[in-house]
Design a protein with these regions (language model features):
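Formylglycine-dependent sulfatase
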Residues: 1-398, 409-437, 444-451
Length: 451
């Protein structure tokens, strides 16, 4: 009997706020509990820390410039194939609900039928982006919770309820299902419904060690989304604003966890649990005050290193921390491998299912791909090297970075052009060049140093 698959996909979730990844400020027992019947991936990475490019990578198994969705607002190429298409052809009933963010901004919600649904046969994108709290941009305060809905209408709750409605519709059906629900939280603006809006005291919020970092690269100071796009410039340099935003963010995470519990409770009570792989993950991380920044994008490791917890029913794998390095582009092939389905289309990713089941190591490298400006980098267990050529406003940057991740896990000491690390820098730079030649990355997406 083929396994059902349920993917719970969040937006901008910081990995280490979850209890299963060492977080201690918000309790996430329902997400954490997924590990009891499967694995938690310690090394899951996205090649692009921006919504659309990361989502395109997950869906197609191909890097952003190859699938077309290289920045927000640019859809996946119509000729692309998604992992859901592979499952649909293997006899699965496929469904999608929630934030899509792989279509044109201007026509979102109007002409979705004209876009590539990537193999999802039953799908609804009712919530569009789901981030309707734009008043935050003007005054730095969250919208009052009375405008946020209740446990039936708030986006996260509504999506969980609709997911359960879908699961109910599959009871007694012989055809297995693959269903993906995309929750648009805990993405900014940071606001959540009652009682989650008052659940965490801003005065008790922990401030990251690097919050007051004095020396940061020019691109981080001027071109990180948390300072440029959604908030008054420098807003989060004021600790009070940061603490209030973080309290709301943790409230969003708690709301997500409660709804994961509601979904898993239904799976168990309905008898679906024993034959359903449940995967919890996100598109990219969140700085949440690290380096004095909020949101995503740019080149620090924490927004590329993302959570994934999955159940593996009937596979003799329980309560395991898996050390296998998994790239988002590996997701589709690996998922197909876990249920013994051949993958019919070309991807840039690989099947890591055997490594996950056997807790084996894999190639421990992640190549950072640009979104819409020239950036390129590489992450390994020991180092991160990253080049940046231009900002979102067209300004040129030359303050590239090299971090020794073992000696400097907070990434506050830039070693670029340090004589003691020259050989490492040269070796990693050549790896970046070779990778992008193999991927045929257009030069317009790359800094000159890695052409």
């Amino acid at each position: 009997m083929k396994k059902n698959i349920l993917i719970i996909y969040t937006d901008q979730l910081k990995r280490d706020v979850l209890g299963c990844y060492g977080g201690n400020e918000v309790s996430t027992p329902n997400i954490d509990a997924l590990k009891e019947d499967g694995v938690i991936l310690d090394n899951f990475y996205t090649p692009s820390a921006v919504c659309t490019p990361s989502r395109g990578c997950l869906m197609t198994g191909r890097y952003p410039h190859r699938n077309g969705a290289y920045r927000n607002g640019v859809p996946v190429n119509r000729e692309e194939h998604g992992f859901a298409e592979v499952f649909e052809q293997a006899g699965y009933h496929t469904g999608y609900l929630g934030k899509w963010h792989l279509a044109d901004h201007k026509e979102m919600g109007e002409k979705l039928g004209e876009y590539n649904s990537l193999g999802f046969c039953e799908w609804e994108d009712k919530v569009e982006f789901g981030h309707c709290k734009s008043i935050f941009r003007d005054n730095g305060e969250a919208i009052p919770s009375k405008n946020m809905g209740d446990d039936k209408s708030y986006t996260t709750d509504w999506l969980a309820n609709e997911t359960i409605r879908f699961l109910k519709s599959r009871i007694g059906k012989e055809e297995p299902f693959l269903f993906m629900v995309s929750i648009p939280d805990p993405h900014q603006p940071f606001a959540v419904r009652h009682p989650y809006d008052t659940m965490f005291d801003p005065l008790k919020m922990q401030v990251p060690e690097s919050f007051y970092q004095k020396e940061i690269p020019d691109w981080a100071e001027r071109d990180t989304w948390g300072r440029m796009h959604y908030f008054p410039r420098g807003m989060f340099e004021r600790e009070g604003h940061f603490r209030r935003a973080k309290a709301q963010y943790l409230g969003e995470v708690k709301c997500i966890d409660d709804n994961v519990g509601k979904i898993t409770a239904y799976l168990k009570n309905s008898g679906l649990w024993e034959n359903t792989i449940v995967i919890f993950t996100t598109d990219h991380g969140e700085y949440l005050g690290e380096h004095g920044l909020m949101e995503k994008n740019n080149l620090y490791e924490s927004v590329y290193h993302i959570p994934m917890v999955m159940t593996l029913p009937g596979m003799s794998v329980k309560s395991r921390n898996c050390k296998t390095w998994l790239n988002v582009i590996d997701f589709g092939r690996t998922l197909a491998g876990l249920v013994d389905i051949p993958y019919l289309y070309e991807t840039d990713g690989l099947d890591r299912s055997r490594q996950i089941l056997n807790n084996e190591t894999s190639l421990e490298e992640l190549y950072i791909h640009p979104s819409d400006v020239p950036r390129a980098g590489i992450l390994t267990p020991d180092y991160e090297l990253a080049y940046v050529g231009m900002g979102h406003c067209g300004e040129k940057f030359h303050d590239h970075v090299l971090f020794d991740c073992k000696k400097d896990p907070l990434q506050v000491n830039n070693l670029f052009n340090n004589p003691d690390y020259r050989k490492i820098q040269e070796e990693l730079t050549e790896k970046i060049r070779v990778h992008h030649r193999m991927m045929k990355t257009p030069k317009k997406f790359l800094p000159e140093e890695v052409w």
